[in-house]
């Protein structure tokens, strides 16, 4: 009997592909009461195993994610999206901010060369070619007085 290769996406719940990028929901952080969304950009021209060009991991608390799900399932989110498109509003339909403090990165041996924290932001916005666009930003951040890691405007990497 031939040995079966391990499945690399065994924690994947779903995956949505776009041109040169994808987002997947994973169940590997449920024990921490978080939904894990991984946003990935890739280049098909690179050799297999080296195709990822950028990657942002977002961890949303399950209660917050369930509120977003309920808004989507009930049609409230779709109604708000239609209203935003009609009035030309540029606000996010949903936004989640998170990050990792510089002290935690240093303790884990993953400190940034500039010594800063890592900030991660995800937004659900009304799209121009499609109804929705899920966007993730990651980059160097600074902690404010409340302990929130903030991403400076225009800094970081954006998906898609």
Identify the function of each model-found stretch:
Residues 1-160:
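Positively charged, low-complexity terminal tracts
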């Amino acid at each position: 009997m031939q040995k079966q290769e391990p499945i690399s996406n065994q924690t994947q719940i779903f995956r949505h592909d776009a041109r040169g990028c994808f987002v997947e929901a994973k169940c590997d952080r449920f024990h921490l009461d978080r939904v894990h969304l991984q946003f990935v950009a890739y280049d098909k021209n690179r050799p297999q195993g080296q195709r990822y060009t950028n990657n942002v991991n977002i961890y949303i608390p399950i209660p917050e994610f369930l509120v977003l799900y309920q808004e989507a399932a009930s049609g409230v989110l779709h109604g708000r999206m239609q209203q935003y498109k009609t009035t030309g509003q540029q606000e996010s339909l949903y936004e989640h901010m998170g990050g990792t403090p510089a002290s935690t990165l240093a303790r884990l041996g993953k400190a940034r060369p500039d010594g800063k924290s890592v900030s991660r932001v995800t937004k659900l916005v009304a799209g121009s070619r499609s109804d929705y666009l899920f966007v993730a930003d990651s980059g160097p951040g600074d902690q404010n007085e409340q302990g929130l890691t903030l991403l400076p405007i225009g800094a970081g990497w954006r998906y898609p």
